[in-house]
Design a protein with these regions (language model features):
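Short, small/polar residue-rich loop motifs at catalytic or cofactor-binding pockets
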Residues: 291-292, 405-408, 430, 479-481
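Internal maturation/activation junctions in enzymes
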Residues: 328-426, 440, 455-456, 574, ...
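Bacterial N-terminal signal peptides that target proteins for export
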Residues: 1-8
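Bacterial N-terminal signal peptides
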Residues: 8-18
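Extended C-terminal subregions enriched in glycine
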Residues: 475, 509-510, 518-584
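Short beta-strand scaffold segments in enzyme catalytic cores
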Residues: 80-81, 85-92, 409-414, 483-485, ...
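Noncatalytic scaffold domains of N-terminal-nucleophile
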Residues: 21-49, 53, 61-255, 260-262, ...
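Active-site rim segments in enzyme catalytic domains, especially the processed small/beta chain
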Residues: 74-99, 279-281, 420-489, 519, ...
Length: 618
């Protein structure tokens, strides 16, 4: 019973975490920060500032984004990481389009039925809270490869990582989000030695008594979790020091990727796995490699859309949905009108049905991407739906083939040379599997849940998958991460955009692009607008309801009025208000940068922690 409830609260918390990430200075996030030299946008003010400082010292956007990424691993522990993986989409100053896949890989000891319990039933707790849930991390390999291949050459890796090392070794003030998260997940952190040492301030007699009571079944699990959360240890502005993480970062700064995938850090990872029935071995770490992939490129009303291909499902789905939307006069529709939401929902259903069947790791499964992103295929798919009535998901199947992956973080950088970079990384759910590698100081991912195990099963975000995304050794799980670049009809960078939020990443990036291209909004104004989401299964429209916790943001909410909801219900649509008990009043957090008329404009999400420094220009 305890494990099942842990899973339930884990999922609810994933959807509610950012509801508490709200700073008092929110109005500033709605300004379009602008300047002429460069910009960085991320979920952490400290991380964005690190990137900008590197630019000021002569670095390019690639140097800046690597500094930002390593700093996020310290200052944003719920999603920033060195224990996870991600994707990069970039356009260099010379016009080269680059996409790098540093997604986690399944350990060689993994197998398709690894998350079945002794009774043969699928165990969410094994898939999310055990050491078996961890894939081989790729973030370190990816960031170092970006630095080596595309950095300016003006810095050493130690200089790039100095900000992250300083904040880990000497401490930094936590924001409201981290204070809330450390307390909210207390009952799970207490199950792990490393997490207890970092995230529990004082292992009090009250905590010990509660643990004894629940183990002896003298109090129910729900009461135990509630009482643990009611013990408030952390406040915004408290200082957190992460000495072991600092040591790990120093090893990486000195030895490059070998500072993580070999030597002392590798020893610590493997020892952690052996002690806790995990699967990652020395060979898995030694053999890990990031991979440059063929970019996914499409067009929308003359603009070029550059995104990530498989194992990301984001690029193919975004371009497929834009291809379908090109058949409608979107510019004439009011955003979030009944007509607009109905059209958008039908398009989303069609694309997510294809995601479930056709997409997976291209090294293992030949995904029919050319078919999925063709404009003819988009028109053919639209024949399955009606613009007058909702089409049940049961009536939508994946398209026939022509023979032949809540917790992420996105960060972007653009410089005056023309380099444009977007990176999305993840450890899957907030704080991953809540396990810290003892002695190494970093959280492990639970990305193995992003595989379809068993095929046909829904993951933590309700996404369903089949053979294309089944578990196999050294395979990379399918992802929803969608770093995307929009180029003008003349081929120049207009915007880099991405989001955090599991399956809702794709539809968030889509709606920002629509608002910029069809409605001529700035990246900030596009991010501000309320959003909706549908993904085939479950067959509902999710929308952003009124924020019960911070009413000052309700100028943007709800994304759908009661009148519009009733009108859409008459068309046959079903609904799920984001304002469920989890407190999730919004769907995802977007971050981006726009370059227009010789100026850089940052776009940061008020759904995040609301700090103006999330987006920095100079």
């Amino acid at each position: 019973m305890k494990k099942n409830l842990n899973y339930l609260f884990l999922i609810l918390a994933t959807f509610s975490l950012i509801a508490c990430e709200l700073g008092s200075d929110y109005t500033k996030t709605n300004q379009n920060l602008k300047n002429k030299n460069g910009a960085v946008s991320s979920t952490s003010s400290l991380a964005s500032a690190a990137g900008i400082d590197i630019m000021k010292k002569g670095g390019n956007a690639f140097d800046a984004i690597v500094a930002t990424g390593f700093t996020l691993a310290v200052t944003s522990p719920s999603n920033g990481n060195i224990g996870g993986g991600g994707f990069m989409v970039a356009r260099t100053a010379e016009g080269e389009i680059v996409t790098l896949d540093f997604r986690e890989k399944a350990p060689t000891l993994s197998y398709e039925t690894m998350f079945l319990d002794q009774e043969g039933n699928y165990s969410r707790n094994l898939a999310l809270l055990s050491h078996k849930s961890s894939g081989v991390p790729g973030t370190v390999d990816g960031l170092i490869r970006i630095f080596n291949d595309y950095g300016s050459g003006n810095f050493t890796l130690d200089e790039i990582m100095s900000y992250a090392i300083d904040y880990a070794e000497n401490g930094h003030a936590i924001n409201k989000s981290s204070a809330w998260g450390f307390d909210f997940y207390k009952h799970l952190f207490l199950e792990d030695k490393g997490s207890t040492e970092i995230f529990i301030k004082n292992y009090s007699l009250e905590m010990r008594q509660l643990q004894e009571d629940v183990q002896n079944e003298t109090i129910p699990e729900e009461e135990y979790i509630k009482k643990m959360r009611d013990i408030k240890e952390w406040n915004e502005g408290d200082i957190i020091v992460q000495k072991d993480l600092a040591k790990t970062l120093k090893r990486i700064a000195t030895n490059g990727r070998d500072g993580f995938y070999r030597g002392e850090t590798a020893d610590l990872i493997v020892n952690e796995m052996k002690a806790n029935n995990g699967l990652i071995t020395y060979e898995d770490l030694k053999d890990y490699n990031s991979v440059y992939r063929k970019p996914i490129v499409g067009s929308y009303r003359g603009y070029s859309i550059v995104s990530m291909g498989p194992p990301s499902s984001g690029g193919p789905l975004i371009i497929q949905m834009l291809n379908m939307l090109e058949n409608f006069d979107v510019a004439s529709m009011t955003r979030n009108s009944t007509e607009f939401v109905h059209m958008l929902t039908e398009v989303q259903r069609l694309a997510y049905a294809d995601r479930a069947i056709h997409l997976g790791d291209p090294d293992f499964y030949p995904s029919p991407v050319p078919m999925l992103i063709s404009k003819d295929y988009a028109k053919k798919r639209l024949e399955l739906v009606s613009m007058d009535m909702a089409t049940p998901s049961t009536d939508i199947a994946a398209g026939s083939t022509i023979p032949e992956s809540m917790e992420t973080t996105h960060y972007s950088a653009m410089d005056k040379l023309g380099n444009t970079v977007g990176i999305t990384t993840t450890i899957n759910l907030s704080y991953g599997n809540k396990k810290i590698v003892d002695g190494a100081g970093f959280l492990l991912n639970n990305e193995m849940d992003d595989f379809a195990s068993p095929p046909g099963n829904q993951n933590a975000f309700g996404l369903i998958g089949y053979e294309a995304n089944s578990i196999k050794p050294a395979k990379r799980p399918l992802s929803s991460m969608s770093p995307t670049i929009v180029l003008t009809p003349e081929g120049e960078p207009l915007m880099t955009i991405g989001a955090a939020g599991g399956s809702r990443i794709i539809t968030t990036v889509l709606q920002v692009i629509i608002s910029v291209v069809d409605h001529n909004l700035s990246v900030q104004d596009a991010i501000n607008l309320g959003r909706t989401h549908s993904q085939w299964i479950p067959d509902v429209i999710r929308y952003e309801g009124k924020n019960k916790m911070n009413t000052e943001f309700n100028q943007f909410l709800p994304s759908l009025s009661e009148k519009k909801i009733n009108e859409l219900k008459k068309l046959g649509h079903k609904f799920e208000d984001g304002n469920v008990e989890s407190g999730m009043y919004y769907l995802a957090r977007a971050h981006g940068i726009m370059y227009k008329n010789g100026q850089f404009f940052t776009g940061v999400d008020w759904r995040g922690n609301g700090e103006i420094s999330d987006g920095v220009t100079y």
